[in-house]
Amino acid sequence: MTKALWTVAEVARALGLAGDYPETPIDLVTQDSRAVKPGSLFVALSGTPSGGFVSSFASSRDGWEFAANAEQAGAVAMIVPHRVDGISVPQLVVPDTLIDGLWALARAARARFHGPVIGLTGSAGKTSTKEFIATYPGASASPSSFNNFWGVPLTLCNADPSASVWVVEMGMNQQGEIARLTELSQPTVALVVNVQPVHLEKLGSLEAIRKEKVSIARGLPSDGILVLPVDLAAPEWPGRVLRFGAGADVHAMSKVPAGESWDVTADIAGRHLAFSLTPGAPHRLHNALAALASVAAAGLDPVLLARELGEVGIMTGRGVEQRIGEIVLIDDSFNGNPASMAAALDSLQARPVRGRRIAVIGDMLELGDEAPAYHADMVGHVTGIDGVYCVGPLMRHLFEKLPPEKRLGWHEDPATLDASQVAALLAPDDVVVIKGSKKIFWVNKFVQKLAAALQASN
């Protein structure tokens, strides 16, 4: 992209502001003063979300308090709730910097783009699938996991107007959030990667989760296409549906190990194509098929995406393997729910090993009243695993059901888990998987600590 994303004058018009504003170019829209660089538009969001949204990262400070920092870093304009003293760049004053500012600019961004837009959601694998689709030539996609009430509008505001396709990831922290995000994004293709028992504590049932995820179709035009797994119902959507998975419109015909990758042959709605895929978590092929189905639904050439899939690495914390001495460590710590936990354990059980198969697994959060049962039920997925170390209060329900010979230990508080003690339980030729909800291992950087402890013991 050679032309600037916006000018200050264009932003002012998008916000409905009267007056004369300069044609100063803007190359980045951000709400984070630490991310500001020369040519940025700084959006000073409130520390407490407005618009009825909720956030687990609410702040006691408001964005306008960092206006001076943003200007010093190179901001050429800023959206603020009131004029801030000492600021020399244009201040675009609106009553609510989220709804009247960031969301209004996002609507203007979407209105000026006339190419295909793929919106996607799901209980797990959203970001990995988005990264697959983002490799399509000329695509513009959400950075990182920008999938909430500020991440989605930022994605739209920063998307390249000349892109071949926009890719917009959508998540949720409360019921009804996906419907609002999809109505803002107005996708031409909507993808639901999967529906799993995640956020049960917030939504109450798997059916409520299904409804929330399928509500992404509310943003589709009448001729839009909803892309779904083969086993997911969506009676709410009366329009066209394209399905992926075994026996569906888009499915894998074969998957053959080929050195450090898989050679896959797939049927994409009657068109056969071959591609390579880096091995990883069991759902990796599922996500690749979802990406191919979405690209085909958008009227793009899936062959162009297939050529790129083999170059997409595994994202940190989502099944990345590393060998430390004679031990293989599988980092699947980014998140965990009953479906992905079972898949990770089943994959470990099926893996040929010279030593032992070891699982270090932590609590799966936000499962509501059924949480103890979901944890205890994992006992059916460790039959072929030699040792299990449980972390967190909920994992005690599994620990107590384990055969004594499989019990490596149970630690209640993830924050005080000693990586060196876990490392001492491991032996040469062991294959170890680390899996749990984000707050158990990922936030505490446990995998890095365990890797360091193993390296120190070599």
Question: Which functions belong to the PLM regions below?
Answer:
Residues V11, S40, A70, L105, ...:
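Residue-level signal for inorganic ion chemistry
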Residues T2-G119, S128-F132, C157, E400, ...:
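Short, basic phosphate-binding NTP loop
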Residues G19-V29, D100-W103, N147-W150, M170-Q175, ...:
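Short gly/ser/thr-rich secondary-structure transition/capping motifs
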Residues I87-P95, A139, P238-M253, L402-E412:
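Active-site regions of enzymes building and remodeling cell-envelope glycoconjugates
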Residues L98-V230, A234-R240, Q448-S457:
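Phosphate-binding loop of NTP-binding sites
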Residues M1-G19, V36-V43, G47-G63, T188, ...:
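ATP-dependent carboxylate-amine ligase
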Residues V76-H82, N194, V227-V230, I358-G362, ...:
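Short internal beta-strands
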Residues A73-V76, V89, G115, L220-I225, ...:
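A short helix->loop->beta-strand "cap" motif at the edges of active sites that frequently abuts
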